[in-house]
């Protein structure tokens, strides 16, 4: 149980609908949207068929100002498994979007900085250690254990930064988007190791991108990718979505993401006047699906992008789920 807990403690939570939590993948995405303000929420539950589920909830909001400065906030909470573990973070983001070039300055580079707090805690009463087991009577919850971690909670300052590129040209069929970011720049300490060992939380690096291809006036496809590395953990995801109108002011989005050696995640979204509802379901495909069947996950997301009255739409290449 301790080994599993250490793995959880040193890797950040993730979402299959990763663009539904934009500031969690890149502070440089603050204000990179087609409106003047945006709000996102995403809920994920995983492994509920085989154990106490991991539940992850994230919310974010960002605004655009006329001064080439964008501001954002994002909050996340994850309750993980049988150990009573909670991972929480909250960040404020400021981004500069004044680097523009091309015809009519409609290609944009945005730099973002994120500062906030990272909190982790667990309930040691929910752990079962080897020396609490009796060969005759079995597990004895009242028995003390020599395997005690030095701390059960921690709060630390945390920092991240990122850069993104978006294309707002309206007369080209293909528009690129992408970015790079790094998190835990100040290397917060891991509180759940022995006092004789100083170990920092590994930095997390993210590379993401793709393009939007307008096949015609009604149909657009968006291939995309995400690569994340944190310590020895690596996540690679690629996918494609199709967006088409099906009613007045309403869009339908359907697609699939593949997380290499882990899961396939089909998703479906419905958009109406700036509001987007999305749902996805991870079907495990890697070794975990063979050793522990029923380890699938489900996500539900909601996003709203709004504009001030009278301001034109900025057609930035920024996918929404």
Where do the model's predicted regions map?
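Sec-dependent N-terminal signal peptides
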Residues: 1-3
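Sec/Tat signal peptide C-region and signal peptidase I cleavage site
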Residues: 5-9
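Subset of outer-membrane beta-barrel
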Residues: 10-321
